[in-house]
C-alpha cells in the first residue's frame, strides 16, 4: 500500500511539473516597450517603434498587443503591426468613423489589450462609454485594411480581415514594428506611452505526449490500488 501511495504521489508531482511547463507556453512571452513619445498631430509620417524577439523555438499560436496612449483624439489615430515574417494587422483605423459619425470618436487615449475574438474596437462606444477619457478593456484589433482617408461610409462595411490570425503559424523571432500616426489636425496631442506584445507559441508535440503519459500513469496506479 505504501508503494502504491508513493507511486501515485510521484505521478501527481510529475503532472504538476508538466502542467507548469505547458502553462508557461500557454501564457506566452510578453515584450514591453516604453516609448513615451508624442505622436505628431496631423502628420502621416507618424511614429515607429520596434521590438526584437529571439529565442522562441516554435511557431505562433496567437498574439496580443497592449497599447497605452494618452491624450489626443482617438478617431484621428491609425496604427498597424508588422511581424518579422511579413504578417500585418491593423490595430487602429480612425475608430468610430462611419456614415453615422463622419468625425469619428473624440475620446482621449487607450489603455487596452487587443486580442482576437474580443468586441470590435472600431465601434467601442456601442459597448461602453468612456466619458471622453481613456478607453480600457480587451478589444479585437480594428482589422480594417482600408485607407484611413476613406470616405466615412466605406468604414460601415469594411472587412476586419487584417487581424492577428495572419500571424498564426509564422516564426516569431525577429523585429516586430508598431507604426502609429495621427491623421487629423486640431484634435490635441496623443502620446504613445508604451506598447506590449504577447506571443503564445504552439506547444512542442512531446509536451502533449508527456501530459497524456502522466495521466495514463496516474490512472494506472488508481486501478492497481483498487
At which residue positions do the language-model features occur?
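Bacterial N-terminal signal peptides that target proteins for export
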Residues: 2-12, 206
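Enriched but not universal
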Residues: 6, 31-34, 208-211
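Loop and turn regions of beta-sandwich accessory domains that flank beta-strands and are enriched
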Residues: 29-201
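A short, hydrophobic C-terminal helix/tail in secreted or cell-surface proteins
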Residues: 204-222
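N-terminal hydrophobic alpha-helix used for membrane targeting or insertion
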Residues: 13, 171-172, 211-212
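Bacterial N-terminal signal peptides
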Residues: 11-21, 216
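Sec/Tat signal peptide C-region and signal peptidase I cleavage site
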Residues: 22-28
Amino acid at each position: 500500500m505504501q508503494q502504491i501511495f508513493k507511486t501515485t504521489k510521484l505521478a501527481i508531482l510529475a503532472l504538476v511539473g508538466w502542467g507548469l511547463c505547458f502553462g508557461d507556453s500557454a501564457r506566452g512571452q510578453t515584450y514591453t516597450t516604453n516609448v513615451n513619445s508624442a505622436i505628431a498631430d496631423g502628420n502621416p509620417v507618424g511614429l515607429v517603434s520596434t521590438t526584437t524577439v529571439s529565442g522562441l523555438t516554435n511557431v505562433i499560436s496567437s498574439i496580443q498587443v497592449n497599447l497605452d496612449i494618452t491624450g489626443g483624439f482617438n478617431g484621428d489615430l491609425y496604427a498597424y503591426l508588422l511581424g518579422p515574417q511579413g504578417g500585418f494587422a491593423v490595430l487602429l483605423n480612425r475608430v468610430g468613423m462611419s456614415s453615422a459619425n463622419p468625425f469619428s470618436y473624440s475620446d482621449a487615449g487607450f489603455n487596452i489589450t487587443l486580442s482576437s475574438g474580443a468586441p470590435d474596437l472600431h465601434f467601442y462606444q456601442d459597448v461602453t462609454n468612456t466619458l471622453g477619457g481613456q478607453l480600457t478593456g480587451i478589444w479585437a484589433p480594428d482589422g480594417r485594411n482600408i485607407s484611413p482617408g476613406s470616405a466615412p461610409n466605406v468604414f460601415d462595411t469594411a472587412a476586419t480581415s487584417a487581424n492577428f490570425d495572419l500571424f498564426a503559424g509564422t516564426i516569431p523571432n525577429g523585429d516586430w514594428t508598431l507604426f502609429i500616426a495621427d491623421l487629423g489636425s486640431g484634435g490635441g496631442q496623443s502620446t504613445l506611452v508604451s506598447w506590449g506584445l504577447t506571443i503564445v507559441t504552439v506547444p512542442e508535440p512531446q509536451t502533449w505526449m508527456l501530459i497524456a503519459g502522466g495521466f495514463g500513469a496516474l490512472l494506472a496506479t488508481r486501478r492497481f490500488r483498487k
